[in-house]
Amino acid sequence: MPKGANGPRGSRSTAARDTLRVRTSTTSQSFMPRRYKADPSKGYFQVEWPLFGELSRALALKVARAYDPELVVGIATAGVIPGAVIAAILDRDFRSILISRRNDDAPVRNTPTVLGAAPQEVGGRRVLIVDETCESGDTLRLAVAALVNAGAKEVRTAVSFRTGPYEPDFHGLETESVIVLPWDREILVDGELVPNPKYEDQ
């Protein structure tokens, strides 16, 4: 039995499964949560907490129907929050791996780099990698390679938002817009919350 599971897959109560089905929409290929539409323009798409919650539930359900991960790994930093939420919904252990194009908030490279060791717990296990967005797929490919090299038995990928040509194994919404996540919209400056300057041209 995978560590962190309550029992064999499918052993959750019928009520719990029905509740999850009711609260998500499975009518579209990308499992878009009900009542929400991705902005088709290439502007900014502000993600509210209710959308993030529904999207996470829908994405977790999509994963569970096709894959049974034993461990969820979020790509730090932006993939940690969706990764932890997906892990909680799936009732699986959660770890993270640091991959970035930046160092101390300053761009230092054109391609992402693995900045920390892969979690040792991936050895011999089925793993789901989670990130918030993917466009070129460079970060996800690096993460997959790092976990395979660390001994993972099988690795699949999931993102909340697919924003480019790369196709992860699972995604929530597909949009060409710049994603503004609810936890990234404001930052603390001199003790006050102010709009994140990287979105100041919105």
Kindly give the residue locations of the regions a language model identified:
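PRPP-associated nucleotide enzymes
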Residues: 2-202
